[in-house]
Each structure stands twice: as structure tokens, then as C-alpha cells.
Amino acid sequence: MKIKSLFVCVFLLCFNHVFSQIKEHLVHEDYERLWLTYLPKHYSENKSYPLVIALHGGGGTAKQLMNNTRKRFNKLADKEGFIVVYPQGIKKSWNDNNTRDTNGFARKENIDDVGFIKKMINQLTSKYAINTDAIFACGVSNGGLMSQTLAMELPNKIKVIGMVASNFGLDEINKIKEVSPFSILFIHGDADPIFPYNKGEIRVFKKTRGPVLGIEKSIAYMCRLNGNSGEPTINAIKNSSIKDNCTSEHLVYPNLKNPSLKVELIKVKNGGHTWPGAKEQRLIKKLVGKTTQDFSACDKLWAFFKSTMN
């Protein structure tokens, strides 16, 4: 009898684990669009949950982002009580509506990724108990640019984003009159060999992928948009991992008129084109640079998102 009870318990634990991570899909413009949904432990229809949309980089997948970040968002979802989804780009790319180049399949074919994400959000909010005032987007590289595009083109749905190893394309300079304010956290390594920290060209395998503003001008754009002014407060992040040869600091740009509109930067000194706290990809380290282990970008992103809910 004890063995039978133990079997039932193990089965239920496995079932709950499978249920918490769900493969979902919809059809948009004749493409089947896919994503992974992770529901927190003890999910209840009687509660209301924030939604975090996590977007992989160019050449990546939804599953890779989840696994390479050590499933940290999932663990935070269990602890903090939010839903996280990992959408999949067509042929591993996102159409971030930036004219810098047409090398990515999604940009080349003008895939309607904004329409897909909008439809995905609508499907999720009709299916799960989601707080529609707390929908956040974040991503790395091409996924970071896609997050920016979502904030600019879906202002009624997404008002807070995070960009990892990415900053604004040169096009954005001319968009400021068309864009509604939104809060943003940049996380960027100043030794990123692919997506330049300073103004320059994105380069992949020595081929240019178009110009970007760089962090300084991207922040200036956001401060102008949101009304942030003055010198930032700067706090060092504990250097808990000496071996990574990186240090980091957190810059917060003040907004006295509207503190709810936030502009922040975590600068990773000597950091590369990587997601802080992620598994280090040794085979491509020379291509992407160093990965700091002093903190998890997932933790910092969620803390930032959560701060905008207060």
C-alpha cells in the first residue's frame, strides 16, 4: 500500500511539472507560431499574475533561452508568482521593424512579429489569470530589439521592457514624436564584440548587420522621451565571481516629475555579447566575449519589472 501511495505521489509531481510548462501555438498570417508557457507552482484562477515575455536572440530558440539562463525565470516565477512565456521566432529571428539590414529571415520577409505577439497576449489573457496592467517584455540581442519594438508599437499592452546585449537602432532617432513613454532597463557589456556598447555597427562573423545608437544615445533618447534628467545614481554590484574578470554597476536616471517612468542601465565592465548569469558557451567564447556570473539578468529584470508595479 505504501509503495502504491509513493507511486501516486511521484506521478502527481511529474504531472504537475509537465503541466507547469506548456507548448502552445496559434496561426498568424499562415505561419504556425509557437511558444512555451511556464505557469508558477500553485497557479490558481482565483489570483492575478504578471506576465513576462522572454525573447531569444537571433539564431537562438525559445528552449535555448530558457535552458541557457538556467531556467532562472521559471524558478523566479515559482517564488514570486508570475507567468513567463518564451516565444519562438520564425527561422530563429525577429522582425524588429528596424531598417538597419535584411539579413534576418523575419526582417527580409517582413514577418508580422508584432501582430503575433499581440495575438499571443490576447490568447494568454483569455486562457490564464493575467494582470493586464503588468505585462513585461525582455530579450537578448535581436530579442532585445524586438522588446523595444513591442513597447513602441503595442503601448497599450507593454509599458515596461528590458534589453540585454542590445541598444537602439539608428532609425529610432526619428521616432520620438510617435512613441509613448515606457520604462526600460538596459543590461549591456562594454566589451560586446557583436552589438557595440558605443555607437557603431553590429557585426556577426565580420559582416555588418547595420548601425546602432549605442548605450549613451539610447539612454539619452529614453530620458528625453520619459522626462528623466540629471546625473544618474551609480551603485556597484557585488563582484561575487572573481574568475569571470567582470565587474558591474547599476545606473538609475532620476525622474522627479514622474518617478514611475524609469530609465536604468546595468553596465557590465569587460562583459561580452552575453546574458549575465547564463551558462558560459565555451565553444563560442571568442566570438561573444565574457559572461559575468556576478548576477543573473533574470533576477535584475524581474526586480525592475516588479518595481514598476508599486
Question: Where are the predicted features?
Answer:
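Conserved alpha/beta-hydrolase
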Residues: 80-92
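Acidic, glycine-rich loop-and-strand cores that form catalytic or ligand-binding grooves
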Residues: 208-249
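Structural cue for short, hydrophobic secondary-structure segments
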Residues: 54-57, 86, 267
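Sec-dependent N-terminal signal peptides
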Residues: 4-14
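Active-site glycine-rich loops that stabilize anionic/oxyanionic intermediates
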Residues: 49, 57-61, 271-272
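A domain-start/cap signature at the N-terminus of enzymes
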Residues: 18-51, 64, 69, 76-80, ...
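Alpha/beta-hydrolase active-site loop
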Residues: 106-128, 149
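Short beta-strand/loop motif that positions the catalytic acidic residue
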Residues: 186-188
